[in-house]
């Protein structure tokens, strides 16, 4: 089955993409990588280093022999999402894309607006 996982760089999306790939599904991750920008802006890092998405996908292929496609795109970009759906033709869409950063949204009004705009 062809499956798109949005938010595939995140806490829930990444392991879900791995699980689905391991089960034999054709997985495409869609992520805008905004979580990494927010963490950098907040000066917040993971307790354990997290490799960039492209590197993690390469390691997954090395250990499993399975490919996971990656599309860097914002779900609020209609043209990008339309192209991805046209190209991939998924049979399922697993949606984990979200801002999970309350501290980011409380910096000021502009950050709160951006958090809500991009929290599809």
Q: Model-flagged regions — what are they?
A:
Residues 1-120:
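N-terminal Rossmann-like NAD(P)+-binding domain of SDR-like oxidoreductases, especially those catalyzing
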């Amino acid at each position: 089955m062809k499956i798109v996982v949005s938010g595939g760089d995140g806490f829930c999306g990444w392991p879900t993409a791995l699980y689905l790939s391991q089960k034999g599904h054709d997985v495409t991750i869609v992520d805008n990588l905004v979580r990494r920008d927010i963490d950098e802006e907040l000066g917040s890092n993971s307790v354990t280093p997290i490799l960039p998405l492209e590197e993690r996908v390469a390691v997954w292929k090395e250990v499993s022999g399975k490919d996971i496609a990656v599309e860097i795109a914002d779900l609020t970009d209609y043209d990008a999402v339309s192209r991805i759906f046209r190209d991939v033709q998924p049979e399922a869409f697993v949606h984990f894309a979200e801002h999970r950063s309350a501290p980011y949204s409380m910096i000021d009004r502009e950050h709160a607006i951006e958090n809500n705009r991009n929290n599809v």
